[in-house]
Every structure is written in C-alpha cells, then in structure tokens.
Amino acid sequence: PYRRQRQMSIRDRTKDPAEKISQPGYQTGKWMPAIVPGTVLNSLVHNKVYPEPYYGMNNKLDRNIIPDLAKTGREFYTYWFRTEFDVPENYKDKIVWLQVDGINYRAEIWVNGYLLGNMSGMFKPEYINITDFARIGQKNALAIKVYPVDMPGTIKPKQWGAAGEFHNGGDGNIGLNTTMLMSVGWDFTFNDGIRDRNTGIWKNISLYATDKAVIRHPFIKSELSKPNYDLAKETVSVEVTNPTQRGIKCTVKGEIIGENITFSKDLNLFRGETKEICFTPEEFPQLTIKNPRLWWPIFKGNPELYELKLTVSI
C-alpha cells in the first residue's frame, strides 16, 4: 500500500493533460509531497500552505484563513495525486489489480496514460483490473484526480427543526452526498466545519496479483439454538469473479481451521461475471456445529473466534 507521506505528490491546477501526467517519468518538480491516506487540506497544512487548523482560531470561518469549499467552489480543492511504482516480474501471466479502498468524493484513476476507472462516494472501494496496461518489471505511473463533494453545504442552520435544536450539519445539503456529514460542522468536531470537506484519498491503495478467479467479500451468518445455545448453524457466502475474457469452471473450497470442517462447490462463470456462492447448513450438514465455542464480553468469558479459510481454484 502507498502509505508513506512522500510516496505520492499533489498538485492543483495544471495545463498538462491527464495522459501526460499519468506517464512514468513525468516531471513533478513543482508538485508537493502528499499525505496518503489523508486529505487535500492535510497535505496543504503539511506543506505550510495553510496553518494548523486545530491551533487557536485558525479554522474559524469568519477569519477566512483557510478557504472554505462552499465559498471557493469545487475546483479550488480539486487536486491531482501522483506516484510511480514497480510491477514485480512474478506478476507475469497473472491478473494485476489496483485496489482503492476509499476516496472522497469523486475521482479519475489513470495508469500509464489510460483512464481505467472512476469512483464516486466516500465509502465504496474499487477493484481495478490493470493487467492489460501494467508494465511488468518496469516503472509504472498512477495519477488520481480527486474532486470534492458535489454539495458542500454551509454552516447556516437549516430552516426547519425543533426549537433549541443544535444545528449539526449546517443547512443539511451535505447529506445529499454519500460522505462524512460531520465535515460541514458538528458539535464534537469543528462547529463551523472542515474547510475542504475531507476531500482526498482517505484509505489505502494496494497493488496485487491473482490467478484467473478471484474471491471477495466473505460473509458468515451464525444462527444459535435457544435457549441452550448448544448448536450453531453457519451460513457462508462469498463473491467469485472471473476477470478474464473467457468462461471458466472453478471450485470454491472452505475450511474452518482446527474443527475438521470442509466444504466445496463447483461453478461456471462467463467472462467478466461475478456470482455470489452460498454454503448453507441444510446443504452442508457439517456447518452445524455442536457445542460451539461462543464469544463472550470482557469479564464474562473468553472471546472465542473461529478461523475460516476460503480458496478458489480452476
């Protein structure tokens, strides 16, 4: 993951096209070091463009020391983030992924001169297949253009509400975005808001490779018998994706480590298809566990957990 603050650079407006910015070797002499994960304002404060907002009265809206998104417009806090990275030789003949865990609020994802993805919403991760554009064993470039929320809102109280109500969220317009509502002002942060509304790459970005089938988003639902809690019925679900251009037949296997419980299913996937596969205790009786080791709160017992291993093979 690109975590260290100087592994990415940041810049606002530039006349260079995205195709050029996202090429390896692009000159970033006028760019600033970026804080990733972090926000645009986080990086600007780090580079002494603006003072620390938590110091004194620096963040007060009426002092206008740090410009507010609602006054400046979205372009003011629209920034490019850029870095270069190597793709290992052992990624050859595999599917190469760029996983972006969280960007606020909209973003264009460019790799080696190509627009490979768009994101919107603060909390939705994106899995971008860069196999056809990655340069194995060579230098690669990643450039991300990040846009603020569509509706920044203001600290002006909304027109409706109960008498004496604390006006968290200002005029409420920030709620039209899928984002962090407290960015416009809340009683346990700044009453008058975060100036850039937390625009930026706020979670990790990862590069990795997989085989021709991929599993994601495993989920386990436990149903305990009552009143004795001496039986646990486990339902396991997982998403399986075929990122290739051909149909595949694959096998998903599961194992509850240390319990001698295994289960598996075969399935066919068309090219680019994603399916959710489900293992139920009705279909797999071994998923009914007798006398399960339960998780107990502190001072009530041991916080027991089971370990589940899921694999997919072709």
Regions found by a protein language model. Name each.
Residues R3-Q7, R11-I314:
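Secreted/periplasmic carbohydrate-active enzymes, especially glycoside hydrolases
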